[in-house]
Amino acid sequence: MKNKFLIIDTSILPDVFDKVVKVKELLRTGHVKDISEGVKQVGISRSTYYKYRDSVFTLSESVAGHKITLGLTLAHKAGTLSKILDNIAQKKGNILTINQDIPINNAANVSITFDASQLEVEVNELMEDIRTLKSVIKVNLAAVE
C-alpha cells in the first residue's frame, strides 16, 4: 500500500502526535539522552512513541528536498514581490517558479514555488516572516511536493 501524506493543523489532532514530535525534537537537540527520558518528560509511553515515531513528522522534517508552493495575495505596491523573494533567498530557499496575476482592485495573486532542501528555518516561520511584510495581504501553503 502506498503511503498517503496530509498536512494537518495540530490543533485538531490528539495531543499524542504533538508529544511524539516533541520527543523526536528533544532527542535531536540532545536535551534528553534517550527515548525513555524523552517520553517521561512529555508524558507518553514508550510503546506510543514507537507506534508513531516513523509516521509523524513536522513540516520541516517532511519537506527536506521537496518543493513548496506558497499562494499569496499582495497589495499592488512597488517592491512587494522583490521583498518576498529576498526573504525566501536569505533563508536558503531556491526559487523555481513565480506566477503572478495582474492586479485587480489593487491586489494580485501570486504563487511561488521553491526548493526547500536547504531551507534554514521551518516553513511556518518563513510564512510568518512573509506575513509581516508590508503589502502582504494573505499567505498560505498551497502545495508540498
UniProtKB/Swiss-Prot annotation:
PROSITE patterns registered for this protein in UniProt: ACT
InterPro entries in the cross-refs: ACT-like_dom_sf (IPR045865), ACT_dom (IPR002912), UPF0735_ACT_dom-cont (IPR008310)
Domain ACT per the UniProt entry, residue ranges: 69-144
Matches recorded under SUPFAM superfamilies: ACT-like
Superkingdom of the source species: Bacteria
CDD domains the UniProt entry points to: ACT_PheB-BS
Family membership noted in the UniProt record: Belongs to the UPF0735 family.
Protein name: UPF0735 ACT domain-containing protein CKL_0858
Organism: Clostridium kluyveri (strain ATCC 8527 / DSM 555 / NBRC 12016 / NCIMB 10680 / K1)
